[in-house]
């Protein structure tokens, strides 16, 4: 059962739950490039060229998605769920493979790495609870950390990759 754990701590705006795609990114960049004419950069010209060789349906979809990305960027600072979740949760997806093996202990997986800032936010929501937090990458010996967090105050250690502590 996948519970939206991270979304309950730091809720993602629903408007951001849209497709994150290269064509949407190109649509957004194309709209921006059109506003800069005639002072386009080389990157602008590549995007313009890409848009001009697309079939009309693909071009229209890219432009529509690009407009939505720009609206979201202006409103939330991020075009889609992808950029927002990395910035706010520290990873691209919500927690998965959640497991409550014992009282007050939660195990979960993330897409990339630990989420100490998310746990810090949780500790600010519950200031009287001390969180003991540890994480490890599936690549043993790298990207590990552990410590305690209470009322937003963190005491974490991050061993060097490849060290005996890792």
Segments from the language model and where they lie:
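Short, small-residue-biased leader/transition segments that mark boundaries at the very start
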Residues: 1-3
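Charged interaction segments
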Residues: 7-166
């Amino acid at each position: 059962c996948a519970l939206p754990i991270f979304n309950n701590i730091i809720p993602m705006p629903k408007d951001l739950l849209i497709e994150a795609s290269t064509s949407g990114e190109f649509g957004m960049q194309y709209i921006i490039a059109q506003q800069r004419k005639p002072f386009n950069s080389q990157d602008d010209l590549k995007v313009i060229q890409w848009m001009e060789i697309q079939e009309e349906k693909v071009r229209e979809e890219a432009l529509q998605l690009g407009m939505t990305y720009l609206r979201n960027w202006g409103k939330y600072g991020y075009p889609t769920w992808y950029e927002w979740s990395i910035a706010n949760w520290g990873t691209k997806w919500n927690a998965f493979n959640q497991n409550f093996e014992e009282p007050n202990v939660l195990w979960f997986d993330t897409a990339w790495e630990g989420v100490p800032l998310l746990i810090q936010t949780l500790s600010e929501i519950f200031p009287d609870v001390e969180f003991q937090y540890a994480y490890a990458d599936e690549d043993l010996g790298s990207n590990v950390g552990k410590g305690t967090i209470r009322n937003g105050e963190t005491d974490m250690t991050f061993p060097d990759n490849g060290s005996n502590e890792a």
